[in-house]
Amino acid sequence: TPPAVAAALSVRGTTLTGTGARGDQPPALHPLVQDFLDTLTSERRERFTGRCAEAVLLSRHLTEADATRTARSKRAARRPMTPGEARKALKGAKLTTRHIREDGDPLHGAFAPPCRSCTALAEHFGVRVIDPTLQD
């Protein structure tokens, strides 16, 4: 199970929020997100890879962008989204994650750095991970 974190993905004025997936079945990720995670070498994988809030939010955003792309063009509808189109859809994206803990736990609400897999995923798609505690 991934650590308990909440994440926010902001892309050009739109913000998606969510948490990691905790059920028996892993979440259905966007094919480009799943493909990237499937290619990670063992030293860049976590045992919960693909269940983190970051992977879930990137998938949600790309799924929405993909639906918009295919609705606009019959040609686009006949082929899957490319990694370049995904990066373009995520241009300027910022991602932050915070710990979810019990009331009174000093870690509750603190910045939660992404795991190795999500760090690589964010870099791959050009998404900036923001630590709000380092902002002025």
Regions found by a protein language model. Give the residues of each.
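Zinc-dependent deaminase catalytic domain
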Residues: T1-D136
